[in-house]
Amino acid sequence: MREKLKLYYLCRFTQLSPLRLSGGKNDRTDNDLMLDSRGLPMIPGSALAGVLRSRLTREDADLLFGKNTVGNDMTESAVLVGDAALPAGAKVRFTHRDGVGLDERKIAIPKAKYDFETAECSVPYTAVIEWSGWSDDPALPLLDALLAGAAADGLAFGGRTTRGYGRMAADVCKKAFHFPADVDAWLAFDSDDVNSFADATPVVG
């Protein structure tokens, strides 16, 4: 039977290598990390969505995340991707590293040295991804498969990922609410509280 659904995926990302995700500022280095209001590194939802979208074909990405066009061809995403944040009090090691600009032949450019900031933390970053739609929506199996693949392969965020930066292991679990049967449980659910996912179903690849 066709049902209205709301799905919540709790994603935990554990660093396997230093993170270099620029916030566009250069107060501390030539390329500062993106930090939240608490001064902790974060992965914005737009960056997480972009990494996930890149794992799909264009057709599947448009179906799941909407079309990035204008006018009548634009479609809205059924997926809401939250920021991946560290818990309060997480201990982070910040490091300033040196780099050098390269030309098109990968040869160092004279006087093109720069520095950038990286972060290392053993505590997982946590993000929530929300999906709303009907049980027969063709985008639904795409999202499950996408996040199962992320859990199996891990993801990489930020700059210099081809050099090994930003690699993270992913652990994903899911809470599903069927309407109208689960309306009371959904009203009592708090997606911002990780304890609300205590009985969530693991998403595995």
Give the residues covered by each predicted segment.
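Small/polar/charged residue-enriched interaction surfaces, especially the RNA/DNA-contacting tracks
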Residues: 1-205
